[in-house]
């Protein structure tokens, strides 16, 4: 799995100047997928490596890899690895094995639309190459399509940052919820990427990040990324958002998204709806930053599936010592991983295609079709 279009390698090299952190990538020399295990951040930086698509799927389930764009890239490479494994069967049973792997990968995280978008692209590329030229061409096509998705994500994230930075001014204090930086993408970030780009432009920006219970993506991952960038920040508990907005401590709020449908309804990390309501109540602009691959323009809010995760995530926290229980082990806990923010609470979407303003039911489709 080393033979790909040289232009793709050159494009990866040209984009690496934007990547202070490489959270995931494909090692073409060894033929393995590599990722930074985000469960261990900020205490340790450990990279995992595999050529087994099942291991990548498990990494998505266990949130070693998380964030919709990152999940999409990982799923793309997982299916490319599955194609390489299926090739050992020869022509007979190749598509059947690929389809089985696709179903397994798509079952990992039901809310993130990027996952389904990415696997559909890789599956289509592999199937077409197999039909035209056979197994070897199909394996190469899968790896190249996954790499295109990787390149598009980095390039798109940088463009989101450039577009969104225009909305920020020196002196702004920006609130963000959950991790939407390099660790949630192929390497630059969406909402946190907007903040990063504005900082790179020399704007005096300050950040307030929520801790983001129950998995603490803000307290663990945002803190790690913001400190690496040298961007000033404060960490607050999720339930402090209303108070700090009521005191005028927030200029703008920017979050990411896991799925955005045609109406503008937005699925994102649990607690986002609460942030949006507080922002609306206190007149704080509320932006959602996401690439085009997160939008599902042919679907309505009924298409959004809310993932429910293990109650143990609520019963305990991840610490430097590992998982630490904070309540009784038999307490009944409910753990929806996402909520849905209605479009009337959203000021605009910041995308790699530009800023999308209301009416969203018209402008989302128009922007994505241009």
From Swiss-Prot:
It catalyses: 5-(methylsulfanyl)-alpha-D-ribose 1-phosphate = 5-(methylsulfanyl)-D-ribulose 1-phosphate. GO terms for biological process: L-methionine salvage from methylthioadenosine. The keyword Ribonucleoprotein does not apply. The record marks 178 as: Transition state stabilizer. Its EC number is 5.3.1.23. Gene3D superfamilies: translation initiation factor eif-2b, domain 1, Translation initiation factor eif-2b, domain 2. Substrate binds at residues 66-68, 109, 217, 268-269. It is an enzyme of class 5 (isomerase). InterPro entries: IF-2B-related (IPR000649), IF-M1Pi (IPR005251), IF_2B-like_C (IPR042529), Initiation_fac_2B_a/b/d (IPR011559), M1Pi_N (IPR027363), NagB/RpiA_transferase-like (IPR037171). Keywords: Amino-acid biosynthesis, Isomerase, Methionine biosynthesis. Pfam families: IF-2B. The active site is at 258 (proton donor). PANTHER family: METHYLTHIORIBOSE-1-PHOSPHATE ISOMERASE. Catalyzes the interconversion of methylthioribose-1-phosphate (MTR-1-P) into methylthioribulose-1-phosphate (MTRu-1-P). Belongs to the eIF-2B alpha/beta/delta subunits family. MtnA subfamily. This is Putative methylthioribose-1-phosphate isomerase.
């Amino acid at each position: 799995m080393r033979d790909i279009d040289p232009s793709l390698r050159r494009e990866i090299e040209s984009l690496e100047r934007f990547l202070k952190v490489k959270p995931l990538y494909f090692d073409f020399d060894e033929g393995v997928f590599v990722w930074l295990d985000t469960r261990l951040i900020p205490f340790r930086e450990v990279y995992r490596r595999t050529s087994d698509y099942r291991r990548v799927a498990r990494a998505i389930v266990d949130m070693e890899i998380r964030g919709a764009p990152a999940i999409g890239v990982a799923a793309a490479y997982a299916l490319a690895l599955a194609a390489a494994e299926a090739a050992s069967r020869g022509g007979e049973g190749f598509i059947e094995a690929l389809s089985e792997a696709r179903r397994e990968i798509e079952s990992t995280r039901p809310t993130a639309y990027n996952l389904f978008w990415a696997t559909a692209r890789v599956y289509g590329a592999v199937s077409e190459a197999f039909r035209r030229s056979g197994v070897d061409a199909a394996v190469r096509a899968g790896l190249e399509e996954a790499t295109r998705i990787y390149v598009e994500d980095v390039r798109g994230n940088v463009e989101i940052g450039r577009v969104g930075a225009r909305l920020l001014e020196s002196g702004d204090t920006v609130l963000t919820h959950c991790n939407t930086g390099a660790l949630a993408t192929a390497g630059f970030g969406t909402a946190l990427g907007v903040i990063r780009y504005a900082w790179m432009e020399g704007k005096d920006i300050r950040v307030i990040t929520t801790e983001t219970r129950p998995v603490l993506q803000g307290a663990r991952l945002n803190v790690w990324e913001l400190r690496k960038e040298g961007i000033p920040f404060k960490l607050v508990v999720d339930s402090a958002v209303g108070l700090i907005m009521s005191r005028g401590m927030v200029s703008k709020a920017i979050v990411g998204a896991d799925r955005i449908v045609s109406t503008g309804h937005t699925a994102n990390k649990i607690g986002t709806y609460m942030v949006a309501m507080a922002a609306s109540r206190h007149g704080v602009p509320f932006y959602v930053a996401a690439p085009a691959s997160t939008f599902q323009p042919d679907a309505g809010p009924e298409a959004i599936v809310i993932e429910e995760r293990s109650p143990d995530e609520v019963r305990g926290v991840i610490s430097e010592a590992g998982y630490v229980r904070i309540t009784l082990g038999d307490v009944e806990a409910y753990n929806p991983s996402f909520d849905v923010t209605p479009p009337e609470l959203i000021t605009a979407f910041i995308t790699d295609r530009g800023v999308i303003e209301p009416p969203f039911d018209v402008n989302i489709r128009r922007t994505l079709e241009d």
